[in-house]
Amino acid sequence: KNDFSLVELRNKVEKAISKNDCVFIRIIGGLLLPLEGYYSILDFICEYRKKSEIVIVAKNKKGLLNQVLLTVDLLKKSDLNIGKIIYKNGNDEKEHEEVLEEIKDITHLEYEFIN
């Protein structure tokens, strides 16, 4: 259960947008996670489609190809602006560079790494 209402979340985002040139919103749990009832994180993001650019952050680990491609496909079908993909290096076994290049070729999105 969320500790906030959708109205409170909208108010917080609008306040942050009014005070800043750039607002970073970290989403944990996936795009289809419900916020209230059947209203998902994706639905909420779509409210800001004209004002936003999405940066996908994914753990750089084996098997990420399908997860990243599904996320990109869902965002594109929702007419959202995707800026780039960031792969976060961790302790997991990393995916091969060829797979990351394949994702780039399919999605036409640039990528970078962070630790």
Question: Over which residues does each language-model region extend?
Answer:
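Conserved catalytic-core segment of NTP-binding enzymes
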Residues: 27-109
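Short acidic-hydrophobic, aromatic-tinged amphipathic segments that line or gate anion-handling sites
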Residues: 111-115
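Phosphate-binding/switch loop-helix module in NTP-utilizing enzymes
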Residues: 1-35, 42
